[in-house]
Amino acid sequence: MNQEVMNLFNGQVPAQNFDSIRISIASPEKILSWSYGEIKKPETINYRTFKPERDGLFCARIFGPIKDYECLCGKYKRMKYKGIICEKCGVEVTLSRVRRERMGHIELAAPVAHIWFLKSLPSRISTLLDMTLKDVERVLYFENYIVTEPGLTALKEHQLLTEEEYMLAVDEYGEDQFTAMIGAEAIYEMLASMNLEKIAGDLRSELADTTSDLKQKKLMKRLKIVENFMESGNRPEWMIMKVVPVIPPDLRPLVPLDGGRFATSDLNDLYRRVINRNNRLKRLIELRAPGIIIRNEKRMLQESVDALFDNGRRGRVITGANKRPLKSLSDMLKGKQGRFRQNLLGKRVDYSGRSVIVTGPELKLHQCGLPKKMALELFKPFIYARLDAKGYSSTVKQAKKLVEKEKPEVWDILDEVIREHPVLLNRAPTLHRLGIQAFEPTLVEGKAIQLHPLVCTAFNADFDGDQMAVHVPLSLEAQLEARVLMMSTNNILHPANGAPIIVPSQDMVLGLYYLSILNQNEPGEGMAFSDLGELHHALESKVVTLHTKIRGRFKSVDEDGKPYSKIYETTPGRLLIGELLPKNGKVPFDICNQEMTKKNISKMIDTVYRHCGQKDTVIFCDRIMQLGFSHACRAGISFGKDDMVIPATKAKIVADTENLVKEYEQQYNDGLITQGEKYNKVVDAWGKATEKVAEEMMARIKAVEFDENTGRQKPMNSIYMMSHSGARGSPNQMRQLGGMRGLMAKPSGEIIETPIISNFKEGLTVNEYFNSTHGARKGLADTALKTANSGYLTRRLVDVAQDCIVTHVDCGTETGLTMTAIVDAGQVVASLGARILGRTALDDIDHPVTGERIVDAGKMILEPDVIEIEKAGIQSIRIRSALTCEIQTGVCSVCYGRDLARGTPVNMGEAVGVIAAQSIGEPGTQLTMRTFHLGGTATVVDQSFLEASYEGTVQIKNRNVLRNSEGSLVAMGRNMTVQILDERGVERSSQRVAYGSKLHVDEGDKVKRGQRLAEWDPYTRPMMTEVAGTVQFEDLVDGLSVLEATDESTGITKRQVIDWRSTPRGSDLKPAIVIKDASGNVAKLSRGGDARFLLSVDAILSVEPGTKVSQGDVLARSPLESAKTKDITGGLPRVAELFEARRPKDHAIIAEIDGTIRLGRDYKNKRRVIIEPAEDGVEPVEYLIPKGKPFHLQDGDYIEKGDYILDGNPAPHDILAIKGVEALASYLVNEIQEVYRLQGVVINDKHIEVIVRQMLQKVEITDAGDSTYIVGDNVDRIELEDVNDHLIEQGKKPASGEPVLLGITKASLQTPSFISAASFQETTKVLTEAAIAGKTDGLQGLKENVIVGRLIPAGTGGTMTQIRRIATSRDELILEERRKGTGAAVATPMLQDMAENAPAAE
């Protein structure tokens, strides 16, 4: 009853519950049904009385009263007249709030086209009428007539006529023989008279007959629009408006400013123009004005309505008085400031404050310090309530006074109020979910918020003036969620990689590292201590130091809780750390009996978390932080200039390198090497020199020295301690301080040949300083640009993945991905164990030798299992993946695996898509902010050999080798791999060997670890002959296809192939080297082809005509690209390029089938390469390759499906089409990971897999079967499955399709939810498409639900959604039973059944 009374006062309609939102085109009747009256005058308000004009844009009669419950003339005031319509002024007595809801309309004197359907490409109106957009515009803007009904005349339907042609036609045929119209009326007639069913039928039959691709595409576009209209029930003529709706006046307010001026919304100006022109047109029609005047007025009306809906879309932009373009209705929705992103997705919050942060080292991990002033303000309502309850005040007014005067009892009550009431702290930019965490407030004096030092990493906060915002969760549910889910103690692990994020940093690490150092010859060395008490005593009395080597008894408890003790060789410092370990025997002392670098501390915290749980970890972290700080303070580590050690050998290394560079210069002058090769070698030489100086410096700094007098070990170099412990600084920075700065990069990314030999301690010369400014400035410029880029990448990722939620426990799929260790240049960069930890095994994993079971199929692979798997030497494991999950919406828990931030299997309702997007996007921003730390120092040492990473026996796959004239083995195969097998015959490593490499081992050889297997020249790619004979040149014409450069000083000539197609004379040449046999004929290769080797541009000839060559000799060399520095600059755009699935500029060409290469007849500037298939019944495939691109295959080479015919970056679409989803996934994951790995950022593969899954949601129809699809349609995978199920049920032929890879932007725009797509990008286009198709948004994702103001269907909101879903399905069941008339008796067992099968809400 109370609620009803309240509603009576508030005039509120209770909120409606709805499950979906539909959008369609408004018919004129619909617009009139919304409207409360027609607006006839352009007037707004009377400037003297400030009252709205009647029938004007703010009319109170149409839109409602200005003041609550008061009519305009003031005859009726107060609640008691509610609902009465005043007879004098015609205003209904009600709330003024209705002025935000009630709409009006304008009856147009002539129809006008809706600009969205006309100009939003592709134009819907012109596609539907099958005319060009230009022609439609000519008709609409009164330039041409159009023939709508030719009758018996020679005119054609839809023919355009100019004014003169129309007059002539009227004269010729008479006015009633044909109909030609002009303006929107004409288009309206044409659209209204369309028979959509007939058109659709005609288009389908035409599609079946046509063969031309272009025509098919055009017909498909039209058919799609026609079908959209048919399915949605929209009529085509509704795209032409006869009535314009007017939005409520309070949404386009008019505010009086002081001084008698008004501030108004632009919409009022735009509406005013429409009304003025419309009224003028009405008057002209009444006056029977000449046609030309009326037509002009109609055109102007059309333009003003265009401007109202989308200003600037057509013609010139309409500007206001101050030359500013007016904001139209479309602009209200678009972009960052539009309705979607500004108001619906980005709302402001009350109960919040912000202030500067300072460090609070005495806080517990779950606490933060809140300034008293701030707390008083934030918790006011709670304080008022408590004051009232305790009887300090009887009214809110009294309570207010007490609080304002800051009476002592207020502070006591504030203490009570904030106890156990968590607050949220947020630091902008919030790049991942750890940017907002909950803490329990403790009151502090002053005005700064105190933050616990350990959570700084998560917030990326420091105390140089950062500010943070505080928010108060008000409702009980909000407080509960803050405490249970967001408390800082619950966020110990990083969601991106599962490593601890609450890890000591900087001073704390330094303190712990200092504690754990072991020095030789310290006082008391070799003493033994029975317990920690004794040890403390000895430390106090200075019998031992923290670093003395001692033997100590460490007491702990075993698994059963029985105390035991063990003696360790250790130091007092390490025992102090061990003292803090949780006393439950699960974490052994060994973990802190080592040097405590940041990595080791992180490992220690991780072990404690996995074995002892969250509570112990939090207590341990707090204690370890206190210990670290206190010992960093006591150690007093600082550094002076002498700590930067310059190695004595530096001068010699530099001198040697300078001589080497001179030698290269000489070789270049002698014509032995090219400019490019010289550049590469010089850069390489300096790169190696820098490394060498750095190594010497590190060796010097690391060296252990002893004091001559006391024999004690001297204290360590403090710079080395800082860097080595991971507290601050990196070896790279140390190298610049004490070694040599090394090579610098130009802004273009090329490396400057002259390095910076000085370091910062010696000081730079002017030239060196100038060279280094490039890098420094580039760093700063990059940072500014990349922050925006990275933010945009994150936004696209979130948008594409926002509806990916864990919805089921297990999908039961049989498919998955194969995981192997990632090896790069012989180094294992990501071990198999690291990649499979926390994933679900697809098959049973057994030990390859003993056959004993390690992990069952469908079980999660945990830390102990990983150790077993690595021990067993298993090379590859199949795991479940989000990519292959078969759930229709979202993913299942088993495919996803472990929730990285909790270390447990992932919960139902976890928003894994958003977490994945944040995990990938967050380091993007981080990296961009970190580019300039190295000051642009270039790092380049090219790899030129293969080493064995394991011991074992060599096996060569696809072996194809020759011995050359020097007697060494040379690799002649294009895809040879060298594998190493261990004694059990299990493959331990497998590496590809480049063509032309020298092999040091052969099949069956035994190798030791680190032994050289093969080496090659990293700067050139050789072309070698496999037959012996005499060289002859073909088409190598001086000046046309080859340039001969002679060096005057040495007389040595070298020949380089130049681009022969740049001159008309050279266009038919095919420069090649031919090998003739003894009888003068062209020698034959082993595969049967001729020994003719085609040369590519820039190849340098190594032989002369007539030279005798033997097998494996080099004929020519092609130089490779010069080294550019890699830093994330190449990185961020690279990641974006991969996620956007763009085709790289010079992309690789991939073989689609296995077979033999044949070179066909060449075109003018393309080379034809044909693959003759190896198996029967397969058509040969032909590729066109631009001439002059380095092409390394010869006629008759055997090639496998998926091999590269032309090198380069492959296009991801090709990988998907040729090798399938799994290959695509592994390519994308590896490429993206490589970029992040370069920066030392660890991201779990599963995050990238989730995004790739979202990119693969669409299928291109290859065979329509009996469905209504058209071949080439892009449909949702889920939709296709549903349609096919129906078709199979009816015994019809299902449609089939190929998966398509969409870039993240495209995928976001093609999401089934139009609300989500519209709020992302291209708002008008998305809404236009959705309206025509009459789309329904099922509100599945997070974004849509935020926009309509509901709980998101993830987390706690997901449970509610689930409960609602189960409830409705039960209701339906009962209703169904009732209908059948079996009564409710049968319904109960079914419900029982449903309750058991319902997914558990976790």
Swiss-Prot record:
Co-factor binding comment: Binds 1 Mg(2+) ion per subunit.
GO CC, any one term: DNA-directed RNA polymerase complex
Binding site for Zn(2+) 2: 811, 885, 892, 895
EC number: 2.7.7.6
Annotated Mg(2+) binding sites: 462, 464, 466
Gene3D superfamilies: 1.10.132.30, 1.10.150.390, 1.10.1790.20, 1.10.40.90, 2.40.40.20, 2.40.50.100, RNA polymerase II, clamp domain, RNA polymerase Rpb1, domain 3
Binding-site positions, Zn(2+) 1: 71, 73, 86, 89
Molecular function GO labels: DNA binding; DNA-directed RNA polymerase activity; magnesium ion binding; zinc ion binding
Cofactor needs: Mg(2+); Zn(2+)
Keywords, in A-Z order: DNA-directed RNA polymerase, Magnesium, Metal-binding, Nucleotidyltransferase, Transcription, Transferase, Zinc
One Pfam family from the record: RNA_pol_Rpb1_3
Single Gene Ontology BP annotation: DNA-templated transcription
Catalytic activity of the protein: RNA(n) + a ribonucleoside 5'-triphosphate = RNA(n+1) + diphosphate
HAMAP family per record: RNApol_bact_RpoC
Subunit structure comment from the entry: The RNAP catalytic core consists of 2 alpha, 1 beta, 1 beta' and 1 omega subunit. When a sigma factor is associated with the core the holoenzyme is formed, which can initiate transcription.
Family that this chain belongs to: Belongs to the RNA polymerase beta' chain family.
Function according to Swiss-Prot or TrEMBL: DNA-dependent RNA polymerase catalyzes the transcription of DNA into RNA using the four ribonucleoside triphosphates as substrates.
PANTHER family for this protein: DNA-DIRECTED RNA POLYMERASE, DNA-DIRECTED RNA POLYMERASE SUBUNIT BETA
Protein name: DNA-directed RNA polymerase subunit beta'
Organism: Rhizobium etli (strain ATCC 51251 / DSM 11541 / JCM 21823 / NBRC 15573 / CFN 42)
